[in-house]
Amino acid sequence: YALTFEPAVFVYHKPSFTKEKPPSTRAEFVDYLKRHGSAVFGKIGTYDIERSGVGFLFMARDQEQFGDIWSVIQAMGAAGVKLYSTSSAILERVSDGRFVLGYNILGSYAADWAARHPDVGIVLPRDYTVVMSRIGLVPQAAATPDLGRRYLEFFMSKEGQTIMARELQIPAVSPDVAGANTANTMREMLGGQLKPVPVSPGLMVYLDQVKRARL
């Protein structure tokens, strides 16, 4: 089951953007890096796709959605991009100004960090926004499959999804749940801009080692 609805976002250091808006598309992201050159060298962060599963997933979806994604990668490389395996490592550096931008950061972590660190801003890319879902399943060999089934049923219920959205600050996927931190609201705001990763056996493609090596 898909339990959440979490976008990949740009994050930025608000005090670094008092004279211009932060980039809101990948083309604007590339343009910003080229225009600012040495001023932002070493101040861009994203996931290390060799060590971060979510980073690899987001980059693989970028390759499918955006024909010119390698221009983004080249621009970040020229800007001395720093690579990390965790969201918190990037967000910490954006919040204190060591980084001006973070690319493809998991939105739920970014939102939690921004709520506690007012200098962190978030942009849902206007060209397209990749969305991933956390998956829940009960293994065939589970010792207590009924308990696992009840656990998933609760988190898929209106009550469970509401707790997830309001208390855990993780966007709820259920259409029965309303509010700011839900798939319903994101779809109303962004419509076709959202590009969810389909929850299907096709997800196994992203575990294929040949595909990972090619990317």
Which ranges hold each PLM region?
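Extracytoplasmic ligand-binding site segments that recognize negatively charged/polar headgroups
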Residues: 1-95
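Short amphipathic alpha-helical coupling segments at ligand-binding clamshell hinges
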Residues: 68, 72, 134, 143-155, ...
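A bilobed periplasmic-binding-protein/Venus flytrap-type ligand-binding module shared by bacterial periplasmic
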Residues: 9-16, 58-60, 133-144, 163
